[in-house]
Amino acid sequence: VYQLIIDQVEYSGTGSILKLIEDRKKELSLLGLFDDDKKKKLPKYPKSIGVLTSSSGSVIHDIIHRISERFPVTQIKVFPISVQGKNSHIEIIDFLDLIENYDSKDFLKPDLIIFARGGGSLEELMPFNEPDLIKRVFKLKIPNISAIGHDTDYTLLDYVSDLRAPTPTAAAEIAVPDKNYLLNQIQDLQVKLNQSIEQKYLSIEQLLLRFKNSVNYFSNSI
């Protein structure tokens, strides 16, 4: 007969990381960093977008292609970051300081920021769970979208950002309107405007005709 007595159970591996993230989430939530009423509204027609992501890989190409295809008048500025590693969150914070004080004759200061990276392991996504980064993003005056990993991946950055996108490509689609949709809207408005003008013209024409008939009637009566 064997007897197993357990005095203490500790998380290890992935379990310990998940517990760390959950503890941080609770602590930051109590500070109000994830409150919905603190979220900033995204610009409807952004003039310039700053994208914080790796300078290599498919993510940045997908974002640039999608934004340029949907709304080509928007400027795109890529701020290349290390999307994983022990100090990558510090690098991101430094770039955020740079963006908020951005001054260039060639590029407008971003009025929208996208954080993006492709999928990865829990360990690889940890920079986006660092409290210092979360607190810095909370203080950002520029509206921002989080697009980290795949649809099933969640980081603390997703909770503090003004909006979470399930994928980087989805972030690009959320960030800007579709020019074809806008053109169709303009064409519809043009048709309605022309119809309204035509109806007004016909109404005035009918009014003048009635007035003319009334004048003729009184003239004949006299």
Show where each model-derived region lies:
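OB-fold/S1-family single-stranded nucleic acid-binding modules
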Residues: 2-19
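A short beta-strand motif that forms part of the nucleic acid-binding face
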Residues: 6-8, 67, 160
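Phosphate-binding glycine-rich loops and their immediate beta-loop-alpha structural context
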Residues: 20-124, 129-132, 138-140
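Small-residue-rich beta-alpha loop regions that form the catalytic core of phosphotransfer
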Residues: 116-117, 121-180
